[in-house]
């Protein structure tokens, strides 16, 4: 059955809520709050089979660090360290003074410098429509930077952007340092680059407390934008780095399936789980990956989406000091190759 991402999202949330069994009550003390955290993650986290962790042993290891009179800060640190064992940027503990996080991209080259792009490639001559910065570079390749999928983009905005870029020989979509946001904006953008219905991926939700209790995958599809709107069907390169996370990871995985698209840069930061939030007895909020999103081929992209073959590039400090963006330069080469193959 054909399902849009919006319908799937609502369906998964509804099914997740209906699948939750009666919750155990926990005391509002260090042990009760810890047990509430461990139990909810144990029953609802969706990536145990990929993370190669013994959650039972991890729980015992960190519970042994508790003390009846420990401070809230000490408890927060113990719980945060336990969650980091999952290696999941979508899994966070949120208190009134801090948010735990696992940001693996901090260990890798940054691979993006906004100033270099603005000064040496756009020459500070660009347009801005809603959350999209765009322009045509000196080599007649179009460039658009979308730095946040939470940023609103209307259909009119996309018409204006793509109409301006229509004369370009190819298009670069830069989503480096885009930490994610609204999946519906992913769909809105992808629809401008397809001419027929696209199988974008599938979503599975938890059906019970067991680590392998999952529904059958729900396939979701994107429809091309109607012919009254503007599409871009020339060669496209998407630029990504390790900070391309969550909804951006999803966008890159979908665009990579299109025949006229290449991915250049570094592996994305992953984050393919659909988050769910719950509260501990003391009021702290917990966010975790609770529904599994796969790509159209059934592959889990929780650990990131690799660049297209031959398109892995890192930026060096020496190049950046000279105002060179090696990832953008490689994108030019790829677009030239793709353009020559079309002739």
Predicted regions and their residues:
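Alpha-helix termination/capping residues and helix-transition junctions
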Residues: 14, 165-167, 230
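Sec-dependent bacterial lipoprotein signal peptides
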Residues: 1-18
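Flexible, low-complexity junctional segments that flank or bridge functional domains
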Residues: 4, 20-221, 277, 285, ...
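Low-complexity, intrinsically disordered regions enriched in charged/polar residues
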Residues: 7-11, 49-52, 56, 69, ...
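C-terminal "post-core" interaction segments
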Residues: 21-35, 40-41, 179-343
């Amino acid at each position: 059955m054909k399902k849009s991402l919006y319908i799937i999202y609502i369906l998964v949330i509804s099914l997740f809520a209906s699948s939750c069994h009666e919750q155990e009550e926990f005391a509002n003390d260090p042990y009760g709050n810890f047990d509430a955290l461990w139990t909810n993650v144990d029953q609802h986290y969706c990536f145990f089979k990929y993370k190669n962790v013994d959650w039972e042993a991890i729980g015992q290891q960190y519970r042994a660090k508790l003390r009846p009179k420990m401070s809230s800060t000490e408890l927060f640190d113990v719980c945060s360290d336990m969650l980091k064992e999952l290696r999941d940027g979508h899994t966070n503990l949120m208190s009134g003074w801090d948010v735990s996080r696992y940001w693996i991209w901090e260990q890798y080259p940054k691979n993006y410098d906004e100033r270099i792009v603005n000064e040496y490639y756009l020459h500070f001559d660009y347009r801005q429509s809603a959350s999209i910065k765009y322009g045509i570079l000196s080599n007649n390749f179009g460039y658009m930077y979308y730095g946040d999928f939470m940023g609103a983009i209307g259909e009119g905005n996309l018409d204006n952007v793509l109409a301006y870029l229509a004369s370009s020989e190819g298009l670069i979509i830069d989503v480096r340092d885009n930490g994610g946001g609204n999946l519906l904006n992913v769909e809105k953008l992808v629809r401008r680059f397809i001419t027929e219905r696209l199988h974008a991926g599938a979503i599975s939700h938890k059906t019970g407390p067991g680590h392998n209790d999952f529904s059958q995958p729900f396939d979701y599809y994107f429809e091309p934008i109607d012919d009254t709107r503007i599409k871009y069907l020339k060669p496209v390169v998407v630029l990504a780095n390790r900070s391309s996370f969550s909804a951006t990871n999803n966008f890159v995985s979908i665009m990579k399936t299109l025949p006229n698209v290449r991915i250049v840069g570094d592996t994305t930061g992953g984050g393919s789980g659909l988050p769910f939030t719950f509260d501990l007895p003391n009021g702290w909020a917990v966010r975790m990956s609770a529904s599994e999103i796969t790509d159209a081929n059934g592959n889990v992209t929780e650990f990131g989406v690799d660049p297209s073959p031959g398109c892995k590039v890192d930026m060096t400090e020496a190049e950046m000091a000279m105002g060179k963006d090696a990832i953008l330069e490689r994108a030019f080469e790829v677009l030239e190759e793709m353009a020559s193959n079309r002739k």
